[in-house]
Regions:
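Glycoside hydrolase catalytic-domain context in secreted enzymes
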Residues: 41, 63-65, 69-652
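Repetitive helical segments and hydrophobic/amphipathic motifs
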Residues: 30-31
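Short, Lys/Arg-enriched N-terminal segments with co-localized hydrophobic residues
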Residues: 1-17
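Short, low-complexity, disordered segments immediately C-terminal to signal peptides
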Residues: 39-71
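Bacterial N-terminal signal peptides that target proteins for export
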Residues: 17-25
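C-terminal motif of bacterial Sec signal peptides marking the signal peptidase cleavage site
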Residues: 34-37
Length: 652
């Protein structure tokens, strides 16, 4: 492990501090990624090297120092502090708290750099997870230590620990990594989505994490958006049905749900991306909506509220030029017209990108707009002091603070956090993450989410006795197969990930029982009857995936795509192209013509044997495109496309 020591000259300017900090973290990440690349041939998006640390906070730098045995209060300190609230309503609890204690409940600092003394002193409303992986046992230790300090505090209110469960417990070793939401949209199976919710809840509880920042209910309308794969697609009806089923599974499994990102994060216009320290093409941009269009998007959130979602996260983006973190119009609609009784949480440091000139004004405006808890990851104490001061001078009303904290306390009470903060009554269906039972469900989703878009000469399914040459950079690449938000935020530099069966390994496992010979040696490729060409995109997250170039062999294409495509063509064999990507990438017309079969796999996650099952005919194609597939970026936003939403061939 490499450590870096840096010295920054003191400054009173908070923005300068943040900018310097980001620069240091970016340099650290770039150096680490550079070293990792020497041992791996995988290639991540260039921009991720500089920016992934703004999320992961360079987790290699002694993250364990803030959670230690010495931080834990002794048992005498834990006896009664949270039990004093046992017979009180949320309103009664809030009435007992000082203004300082109330403001602390509105803060959501990140665990990295957070001392347990600070948790015990301030008793924050929640703690945001780090975005790097560890074992389930280590997660339990980490979260239990924080909770012991919270309930051992004078205030004694338990925290809720929040984590992005984007496609399973992606920061836990050996957990089930489900296909991404774009696959869920292609599968379009409500019953399976409910099961995914239950499994995610069970594995999350095995890590002692109760608050999940999911589902993402974005309507993805432009594939150039880097978060396209986090969406179920472009059809609002499909998004509503699938996300609601998922939410019900999470809730029945015992989690606190957070629907996101309110409002219109997937409807932003290309070219309006946020222009701060990082220049984005589309992410966090502006959506131009009529009232009728906004009302249609609100229906998805109404369904989430009716299903029981307890929290909603605000989008980084804007609607009609107003940042959602200060957009009182729509937040009021959420609480008043849609009847949302839970609490609203901000997204990562996004208050800092609102219109006010000072951070103090930004916080005040966001509170008054209706945000209840603040994910300002390393300025939590500044958020708290600003709220206290603003109530004192009348810029924030006491009523607004009481409403926010009542909502937070109510969610904690109803989720059982007060009655069992240390998970002593915890019940899970499995003893550990990554069970075979849960992997089978993930494999089912892989099989149902694959979309067959071309199958000339009935090349598929592969027949017994077929010799298959497997080639291409996505064939045996766990990270490419799982996509972003896997082990880390933007992507792990490793090709191999614990518990992941790649497409190639899946074929090798099934070869004998299906009477198929798998060839991976280039020198023997000419012996093959069929070429299985596995190509796709690099892994990325958020704005790192924003691109004007959607070509399969473009800026975000996997290194080796071009060479593998040429190799397959030169062999002159029937070719099955498997596309492993987070969106409908643009294919070369000649390639579309040359390939006998084309299969869109999207990002199938850990169970790559599901791909082999379908191609060998053990399972049938049933997936359909969740969004249109364009032939050219010029078609985006028009009715012209290569394949329409809902298209998908099946075996005859």
């Amino acid at each position: 492990m490499v450590y870096f020591q840096w010295e920054i000259k003191p400054t009173k300017n908070r923005r300068t501090i943040m900018k310097n900090r980001k620069l240091i973290l970016a340099v650290c990440a770039a150096m680490i990624m550079s070293m990792a690349s020497c041992a791996s041939s995988s290639s991540n998006a260039d921009s991720s090297k500089a920016e992934s640390s703004s999320q992961t906070e360079s987790s290699s730098v002694s993250e364990s120092s803030s959670v230690t045995e010495s931080s834990k209060p002794d048992s005498s300190e834990l006896t009664d502090n949270h039990h004093k609230y046992d017979n009180m309503t949320a309103e009664q609890i809030v009435a007992k708290l000082s203004l300082q204690e109330k403001a602390n409940q509105m803060a959501l600092p990140q665990i990295l750099g957070l001392s347990m003394d600070s948790v015990k002193k301030n008793c924050y409303g929640g703690v945001l997870s780090k975005i790097s992986a560890q074992s389930a046992a280590d997660w339990r230790t980490t979260i239990d230590t924080i909770q012991k300090n919270a309930i051992g505090s004078q205030t004694g209110i338990p925290i809720i620990y929040g984590q992005d469960q984007v496609h399973g417990i992606y920061v836990c070793y050996n957990s089930v990594i489900f296909p991404h939401n774009i696959n869920m949209g292609a599968a379009n199976d409500k019953e399976l989505m409910y099961k995914v919710g239950q499994i995610t809840a069970d594995e999350s509880k095995l890590c002692h994490t109760l608050w999940t920042y999911s589902p993402c209910v974005a309507q993805s309308v432009d594939p150039r958006w880097g978060r396209t794969y986090e969406s179920y697609g472009s059809d609002l009806g499909r998004i509503t049905e699938l996300s609601t089923s998922f939410t019900k599974g999470l809730l029945d499994g015992g989690l606190i749900v957070c629907a996101k990102h309110f409002l219109a994060d997937g409807n932003v216009k290309y070219g309006t991306g946020e222009q701060g320290d990082i220049k984005m093409l589309i992410d966090r941009g502006d959506a131009t909506l009529t009232d009728a269009q906004a009302d249609e998007l609100m229906k998805v959130y109404k369904a989430q509220i009716d299903a029981g979602a307890q929290t909603i996260m605000i989008s980084h983006s804007s609607v009609n030029g107003v940042k959602m973190h200060e957009n009182k119009k729509y937040i009021d609609k959420l609480k008043n017209e849609l009847g949302f009784k839970g609490f609203i949480v901000s997204d990562w440091n996004s208050v800092q990108n609102t219109s006010a000139k000072t951070y103090e004004e930004q916080i005040i405006n966001s509170v008054n707009a209706g945000i209840d808890m603040f994910m300002e990851v390393d300025t939590a104490d500044e958020v708290v002091s600003t709220i206290v001061k603003a109530v004192g001078d009348g810029r924030i009303s006491q009523q607004r603070v009481d409403d926010a904290v009542t909502r937070i306390i109510r969610v904690k009470q109803e989720a059982g956090v007060f009655s069992d903060p240390m998970f002593e009554k915890l019940e899970t269906k499995q003893k550990d993450v990554g069970s075979e039972e849960y992997r089978k469900v993930a494999q089912q989703l892989v099989e149902k989410s694959m979309v067959l878009v071309k199958n000339d000469n009935k090349t598929l399914p592969l027949k017994k006795g077929t010799k298959v040459y497997i080639t291409g950079p996505a064939a045996d690449h766990a990270q490419a197969q799982c996509g972003g938000w896997t082990m880390e935020w933007n992507a792990s530099p490793r090709r191999e990930i614990d518990g992941v069966t790649t497409i190639q390994k899946g074929f090798e496992q099934l070869a004998q029982q299906n009477g198929i010979t798998v060839i991976t040696d280039k020198s023997k490729a000419a012996e093959a009857d069929v070429v299985l060409l596995c190509v796709g995109e690099q892994s990325y997250a958020e704005w790192n995936g924003d691109t004007e170039d959607l070509a399969l062999c473009g800026k975000l294409g996997l290194e080796g795509n071009k060479e593998a495509i040429k190799e397959a063509k030169d062999l002159g064999k029937p070719t099955v192209a498997c596309i492993v990507a987070g969106r409908n990438v643009i294919l070369d017309e000649a390639d579309k013509k040359n390939w006998d079969s084309i299969v869109m796999c999207y990002l199938p996650g850990s169970e790559g044997q599901g791909v082999a099952n379908v191609l060998c005919g053990n399972a049938k194609f049933s997936g359909t495109l969740p969004s249109p597939w364009y032939s050219d970026v010029k078609q985006i936003g028009t009715n012209d496309c290569w394949l329409k939403k809902g298209f998908g061939l099946k075996y005859e």
